[in-house]
């Protein structure tokens, strides 16, 4: 029997790439604001806005074998231009929504289930203009490790920390050739990430054959967090 995976925010970018890679082997449930890119895919769509809606398990199966939370923000501004409301909004979307959903789905998570969250390279590597998003993603890293400890050995919990990835979320940072080249050159591998780079690791962490990795924050960042070659 196919195993069940819940993707929140799986209608574009990294989440969509994960769904494409896993739809043949798993039964995929996607909770997202939009579904136009899902119409010809073998997935179950649940209308859900992580910033405004209350998540329920009404449309979920009895058992879940995997959970991925994909929504995020790239709110890059100097601290003096950020309001407290901006920090609250980033925390709500990136962190508090995860907590709310996890509390709903935990009773459905089976023995050996896997959860995957997303952080950012800017948590481990201090970067200017990242105060709000780094704070929110840092909360995810702490939550992920504590959750992994609390629910071991039943549930594995890991977080992926990417650098800049070419997705709709980062469009304004990569919307012309000059910007793209600057961002490419910042990375030791001389390119920004693609959705498939991150999705490949997420799928690996979800796979039931990968049963000895938990409580980790794994960087997928073209080497930018550890290599200084510029």
Question: At which residue positions do the language-model features occur?
Answer:
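N-terminal Rossmann NAD(P)H-binding glycine-rich loop of SDR-like oxidoreductase domains
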Residues: 11, 19
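Substrate-binding pocket helix/loop in short-chain dehydrogenase/reductase
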Residues: 78-79, 83-91, 183
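Active-site helix of classical SDR
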Residues: 102, 136, 144
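Alpha-helical segment proximal to the catalytic Tyr-Lys
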Residues: 107, 148-153
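Short, small/polar-rich loop/turn modules that mediate ligand/substrate recognition or access, typified
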Residues: 152-156, 213-215
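A conserved structural motif in NAD(P)-dependent oxidoreductases
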Residues: 187-198
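Short C-terminal tail/terminal secondary-structure segment
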Residues: 203, 214-230
């Amino acid at each position: 029997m196919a195993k069940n995976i819940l993707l929140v925010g799986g209608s574009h970018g990294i989440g969509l790439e994960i769904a494409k890679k896993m739809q043949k082997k798993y039964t995929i449930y996607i909770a997202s604001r939009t579904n136009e890119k899902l119409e010809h895919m073998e997935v179950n769509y649940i209308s859900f806005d992580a910033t405004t809606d209350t998540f329920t398990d009404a449309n979920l199966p009895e058992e879940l074998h995997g959970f991925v939370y994909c929504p995020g923000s790239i709110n890059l501004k100097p601290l003096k231009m950020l309001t407290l409301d901006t920090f609250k909004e980033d925390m709500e979307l990136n962190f508090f929504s995860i907590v709310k959903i996890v509390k709903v789905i935990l009773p459905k998570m089976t023995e050996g289930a896997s959860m995957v969250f997303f952080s950012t390279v800017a948590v481990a590597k201090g970067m200017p203009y990242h105060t709000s998003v780094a704070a929110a993603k840092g909360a995810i890293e702490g939550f992920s490790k504590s959750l992994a400890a609390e629910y071991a050995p039943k549930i594995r919990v890991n977080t992926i920390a990417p650098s800049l990835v070419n997705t709709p979320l980062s469009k304004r940072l990569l919307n012309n050739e000059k910007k793209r080249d600057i961002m490419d050159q910042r990375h030791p591998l001389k390119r920004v990430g693609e959705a498939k780079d991150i999705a490949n690791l997420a799928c690996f962490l979800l796979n039931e054959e990968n049963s000895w990795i938990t409580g980790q924050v794994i960087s997928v960042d073209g080497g930018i967090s550890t290599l200084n070659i510029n």
